[in-house]
């Protein structure tokens, strides 16, 4: 999803809450990001900071470093800082439920970004349609390589809605076009891991024709 559009959507949902803009002016919102080692999430952070500033908010950004325990500690910390809204990009769609439960108990409105949460009360979820995106990628490969192409898949972080949905969407296309799935392994949305996993898979599947990576960082690796 375009980060400018995402920032606008985030602000729109915040503004539709029960607290008015004027009442919240100069108050602090919080953004908890799964990792800032991924350029996508840096762009997300930058867009959120720009929109928060334009609306007169302070934005506190915390990095969970792809660690659910760090994510939980971040949210626990935020509940005593007096922030008004929590924007969270989950490290794991199941594990984040513990962090959201703490925010819910503190009556802190929660919005999830890019990755959904399987538990807890969330005001809104803002993301692209990852199932549709995965299917589009598979259909595109079919236009270039035809039916029954030999494919390898680089998966994202297990447990995230983005990895699950992109994989599910790609499978729809793979089944429709009778792809031969030679291998599919996780590389955790990481460039270096993408390189290492791809090298290992290529050593056993030299006849591969195409690769589907569930994010751009793995593809660049």
Q: Which residues does each PLM region occupy?
A:
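N-terminal secretory signal peptides that target proteins for export/translocation
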Residues: 1-3
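A residue-level marker of the well-folded mature domains of exported/periplasmic proteins
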Residues: 5-7, 15, 23-221
């Amino acid at each position: 999803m375009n980060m400018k559009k995402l920032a606008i959507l985030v602000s729109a949902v915040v503004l539709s809450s029960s607290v008015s803009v004027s009442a919240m002016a100069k108050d602090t919102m919080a953004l908890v990001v799964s990792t800032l080692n991924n350029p996508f999430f840096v762009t997300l952070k930058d867009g959120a900071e720009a929109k928060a500033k334009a609306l007169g908010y302070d934005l506190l950004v915390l990095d969970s470093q792809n660690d659910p325990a760090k994510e939980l500690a971040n949210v626990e910390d935020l509940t005593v800082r007096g922030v008004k809204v929590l924007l969270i990009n989950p490290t794991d769609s199941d594990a984040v439920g513990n962090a959201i439960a703490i925010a819910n108990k503190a009556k802190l409105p929660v919005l999830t970004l890019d990755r959904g949460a399987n538990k807890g009360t969330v005001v809104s979820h803002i993301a692209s349609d990852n199932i549709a995106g995965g299917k589009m990628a598979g259909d595109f490969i079919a236009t270039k390589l035809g039916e029954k192409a030999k494919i390898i898949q680089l998966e994202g972080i297990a447990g995230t809605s983005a990895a699950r949905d992109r994989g599910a969407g790609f499978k729809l296309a793979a089944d429709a076009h009778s792809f031969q799935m030679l291998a599919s392994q996780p590389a955790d949305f990481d460039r270096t891991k993408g390189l290492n996993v791809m090298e290992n898979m290529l050593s056993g599947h030299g006849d591969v024709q195409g690769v589907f990576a569930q994010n751009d960082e793995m593809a660049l690796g």
